[in-house]
A protein has these predicted regions:
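Residues embedded in well-ordered beta-strands within globular domains across many folds
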Residues: 114-117, 142
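SEC14/CRAL-TRIO lipid-binding/transfer domains and related phosphoinositide-recognition modules
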Residues: 1-108, 121-147
């Protein structure tokens, strides 16, 4: 409750973390959510901002029947991600909450998570996050390109 003060849906600070792409014209295609952890100032964010961001998007998309049926694919562009960025989000409590929300609390069909331009220092963070996922979702996490 304390973490979600000022949860305005159009809070620009939150939208610097994630971007929801428009619906595809192809019926049955998943929605795409892009995250760019290296594109923000790490001094402005708390670890709970990631959880807040994801929850706001899921709350908004709950009104879209196509989203619930077709699911979503998350795309992560990790370019320019530094150790300072990772320290903002490398909080096991927030990672666990985020994983549980995505796979258990919302009727969201996670189609995949594709990460590219991932620095090697981010591998341990990704492995920590995967610990909280069920086997089906773990198998859908793909690293496209390491930097």
């Amino acid at each position: 409750k304390e973490n979600f003060k000022n949860s305005q849906k159009f809070d620009l600070k939150i939208h610097r973390i994630t971007l929801l792409l428009p619906k595809s014209k192809t019926p049955g295609a998943p929605r795409y959510l892009i995250g760019r952890p290296g594109a923000f100032n790490p001094d402005e964010f708390k670890s709970d901002d990631l959880l807040k961001s994801m929850t706001i998007f899921f709350d908004t998309l709950m009104f879209d029947d196509d989203f619930i049926i077709s699911g979503m694919t998350m795309i992560g562009d990790a370019s320019n991600t530094t150790l300072k960025h990772l320290m903002v989000f490398n909080n096991p409590v927030v990672m666990k909450k985020n994983a549980l929300i995505q796979q258990d609390a919302y009727p969201v069909r996670q189609k995949g998570m594709h990460i590219f331009n991932m620095p090697s220092i981010m591998v341990s963070m990704l492995n920590l996050f995967k610990m909280f996922l069920n086997e089906k979702n773990k198998s859908r996490v793909k690293i496209i390109k390491m930097t």
